[in-house]
Amino acid sequence: KWCAPLLDLPAHCYPQSYFARRIELGASEVNRLFLTACGVTHSLIETGFRGTEIHGPDGMAKLAGHKVDKVIRLETTAEKLLDTGTVTSESFVTDFARELAIAAKGAVGLKSIVAYRYGLHFEPSPPSQQEVQKAIEPVLRQVDSGAPARIDDPILLRHLIFAGLELNLPIQFHIGYGD
């Protein structure tokens, strides 16, 4: 019910005391105390946004003291692949399918941020390979110029979703913070 008692403080302590105690214990210990006390027994974690700045599944499992499974973000997987500079418009469909299958090993689900990048009013059918090849060309030029890949073309976003469906994993559609 109250966070302060988990830190060995009175429930209604002064804010200064609360923050001082958090600083004294350190972020890892405070996170461990809160996560183990919350009663959650299984978590899912998606590391596609600022993945190097957060705990991955193993780190969260250690902190939380319970099972943590991973969810793979489609757009991040594709953009990391494109940023390697090894992809062509002809190879993208096959290369992405391979990379997604590798990334999804052991995952319990996938996630798309199509709503954030384009919206949810998109053609609900898979694009043709020719459409994907044409749509990926501007992204490849972007990467060739030294900029990081960013997929926001509706044809490419649809392709990622339909490629994800081939893995028979559930897909979460991010439509806002906290979903």
Set out the residue ranges of the language-model regions.
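Metal-cofactor-binding active-site regions of metalloenzymes
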Residues: 1-167
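Short glycine/proline-centered loop/turn elements that form peptide/ligand docking sites
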Residues: 177-178
